[in-house]
Every structure is written in structure tokens, then in C-alpha cells.
């Protein structure tokens, strides 16, 4: 095997005309018509939202309900996993201790904030 120092100049020589007018394979590729993108139908059929053309499938699907009778996979315990926390943000809704933005900010050195500030 060759050293890395020797291989780099070899690659530079091998690919010097790559993707240029001298690259016959690349020029043939450019002449081809563009391919159409793949079409995937009903890729989100389980996710809800657009519910047209689904027939009676959504009316009585009790086998897909979890333990707590909510919609989801069988026995999916999402409500138990989140313990009442919202999904959207991680901002603490109920603080355990008071929040002071600066060490000795608006309320001075030895003053507590009003009761509803928590």
C-alpha cells in the first residue's frame, strides 16, 4: 500500500478532470432527462389529519386503544410517561424554589419577592 502523502497526488491526477467538459461519463449524465420524484401515497395514514377515503376504519378501532382508553398503540402509556407534563416545551411550569434573575436584583439584598412571584 502507498503512503497517504503519495496517495493524495495520485488522486489529484486521477480526478483532475472530474465533473468538467473532459469527463465523458459526467457529460453523458448531464444529457439525461431529469427523473421524476417518487410518489408515496398515504405515508401518514396513522398520523391522523386528512381522514378522507378511510371508510369505517376510524369508527370502532378498540383494539388500537391503550390501557387508559386513549387512542394510540396497544398499551401505550404515553400519559403515564409524561406525568402530566406538556410536550411542547421544557420550561418549568411550577418552580420548587423562587427564581431570582440576579443575585441582588430588583428586590435588594435582604428582601423576599411578593408571594405570587414563585
Curated annotation (Swiss-Prot):
One of its GO terms (cellular component) is mRNA cap methyltransferase RNMT:RAMAC complex. Pfam families: RAM. It comes from the Eukaryota. Residues 76-93 have a biased composition (Polar residues). GO terms for molecular function: enzyme activator activity; RNA binding. Residues 45-56, 98-109 have a biased composition (Low complexity). Residues 56-118 are annotated as: RNA-binding. A motif (RNMT-activating domain) lies at residues 36-42. Residues 2-55 are annotated as: Interaction with RNMT. InterPro entries: RAMAC. The keyword Coiled coil does not apply. The modification N-acetylthreonine is found at residue 2. One of its GO terms (biological process) is RNA 5'-cap (guanine-N7)-methylation. The modification Phosphoserine is found at residues 36, 86. The keyword Acetylation applies. It is found in: Nucleus. Residues 30-118 are annotated as: Disordered. PANTHER family: RNA GUANINE-7 METHYLTRANSFERASE-ACTIVATING SUBUNIT-LIKE (PSEUDOGENE)-RELATED, RNA GUANINE-N7 METHYLTRANSFERASE ACTIVATING SUBUNIT-RELATED. Interacts with RNMT; this interaction enhances mRNA binding and cap methyltransferase activity. Belongs to the RAM family. This is RNA guanine-N7 methyltransferase activating subunit. It comes from Pongo abelii (Sumatran orangutan). The lineage of its organism: Eukaryota, Metazoa, Chordata, Craniata, Vertebrata.
Amino acid at each position: 500500500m502507498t503512503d497517504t502523502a503519495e496517495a493524495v497526488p495520485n488522486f489529484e491526477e486521477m480526478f483532475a478532470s472530474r465533473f468538467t467538459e473532459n469527463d465523458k461519463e459526467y457529460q453523458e449524465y448531464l444529457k439525461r432527462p431529469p427523473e421524476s420524484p417518487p410518489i408515496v401515497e398515504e405515508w401518514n395514514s396513522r398520523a391522523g389529519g386528512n381522514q378522507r377515503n378511510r371508510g369505517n376504519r376510524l369508527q370502532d378501532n378498540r383494539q388500537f386503544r391503550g390501557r387508559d382508553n386513549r387512542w394510540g398503540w396497544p398499551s401505550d402509556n404515553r400519559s403515564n410517561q409524561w406525568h402530566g407534563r406538556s410536550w411542547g416545551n421544557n420550561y418549568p411550569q411550577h418552580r420548587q424554589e423562587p427564581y431570582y434573575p440576579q443575585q441582588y436584583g430588583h428586590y435588594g439584598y435582604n428582601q423576599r419577592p411578593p408571594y405570587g412571584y414563585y
